């Protein structure tokens, strides 16, 4: 009987040992998975939907998860593997700043373009900060794609699905740009002369002798959506990236423009008013509601405050007409807000411009 009980005890001890060993092994595997394989979670604070949408479009790695956060999420900052802050115009109080600083001790944090020195919270080392800043400042799909890869591989330390990031693609500040017809989700193509741009249009079947011509400028919208809408209606579109240089350098004099479309936020300035007078052409001002389209549609007031002033009132000083809503925001597949041209309103706007020219 005693021998039987002893045998049972040995078996129980063996089972307990094996169970403990399994727990240790599983725990080790879980830690290894989290350290080398798991998802890299990157939080973006105070980012405009236009910029965040571009970063989202550059992300093709299923193991990288992007999230837009606000001050309401500050109690959960430890949930992320990296925090990137747009410091321009960031409004946080002392308590919120303290929360962000404390989180930065545990979570690698990078703030760029801080207008308030107190908000310049950075906890990555100088080398990483400088490299990430270069990706951000140069922008574009390639740079954003490499930035995300850099964060996963070198900041988060993951081994699985962690490709080597490419070097920073230093993008010149082109005079004109256009989306790539062969890769609409890729980086915009850049041009520094009308001759280059016209050759590109001709090569892609977009150059049309005698067609009405639009100068498209500004950054408060999805420019490719508007380019495509006008080109579909038979317009020639010159997407101006450096408007002042374009006019001062007399590049505009070689184009028989019929109208200017400015995706405005604020004034262009007196030099541009003189340009409109000389050319005797109209200036149109499509609006970006800067919020979810569904929220805007359900709001009887629609637009108010300083954003309305910068979008409607100050552009009218330049002579802008037809302040018509064309751009809104929607939720993309990553759960982030992105700017897009609202199809029916875009079509109505283009037809309205067509009626003037």
PLM features per residue range, with description:
Residues 2-357:
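An N-terminal assembly and electron-transfer interface module characteristic of large anaerobic redox
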């Amino acid at each position: 009987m005693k021998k039987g009980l002893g045998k049972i005890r040995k078996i129980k001890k063996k089972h307990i040992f094996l169970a403990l060993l399994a727990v240790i092994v599983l725990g080790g595997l879980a830690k290894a998975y989290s350290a080398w394989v798991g998802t890299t979670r990157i939080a973006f604070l105070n980012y405009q939907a236009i910029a965040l949408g571009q970063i989202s479009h550059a992300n093709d790695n299923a193991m990288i998860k992007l999230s837009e956060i606000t001050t309401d999420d500050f109690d959960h900052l430890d949930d992320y593997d990296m925090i990137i802050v747009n410091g321009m115009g960031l409004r946080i109080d002392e308590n919120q700043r303290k929360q962000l600083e404390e989180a930065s001790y545990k979570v690698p944090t990078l703030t760029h373009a801080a207008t308030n020195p107190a908000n310049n919270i950075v906890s990555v080392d100088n080398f990483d900060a400088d490299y990430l800043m270069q990706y951000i400042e140069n922008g574009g799909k390639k740079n954003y794609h490499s930035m995300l890869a850099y964060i996963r591989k070198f900041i988060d330390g993951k081994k699985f699905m962690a490709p080597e990031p490419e070097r920073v693609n230093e993008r010149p500040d082109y005079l004109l740009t256009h989306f790539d017809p062969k890769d609409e989700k890729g980086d915009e193509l850049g041009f520094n002369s009308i001759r280059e741009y016209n050759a590109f249009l001709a090569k892609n079947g977009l150059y049309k002798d005698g067609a009405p011509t639009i100068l498209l400028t500004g950054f408060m919208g999805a420019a490719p959506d508007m380019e495509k809408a006008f080109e579909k209606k038979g317009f020639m579109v010159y997407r101006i990236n450096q408007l002042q240089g374009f006019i001062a350098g007399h590049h505009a004099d070689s184009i028989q423009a019929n109208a200017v479309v400015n995706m405005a936020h604020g004034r262009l300035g007196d030099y541009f008013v003189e340009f409109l007078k000389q050319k005797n052409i109209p200036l149109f001002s499509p609006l970006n509601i800067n919020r979810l389209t569904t929220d805007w549609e359900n709001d009887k007031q629609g637009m108010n405050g300083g954003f309305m002033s910068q979008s409607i009132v100050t552009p009218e000083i330049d002579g802008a007409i037809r302040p018509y809503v064309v751009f809104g925001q929607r939720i993309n597949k990553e759960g982030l807000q992105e700017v897009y041209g609202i199809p029916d309103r875009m079509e109505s706007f283009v037809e309205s411009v067509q009626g003037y020219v």
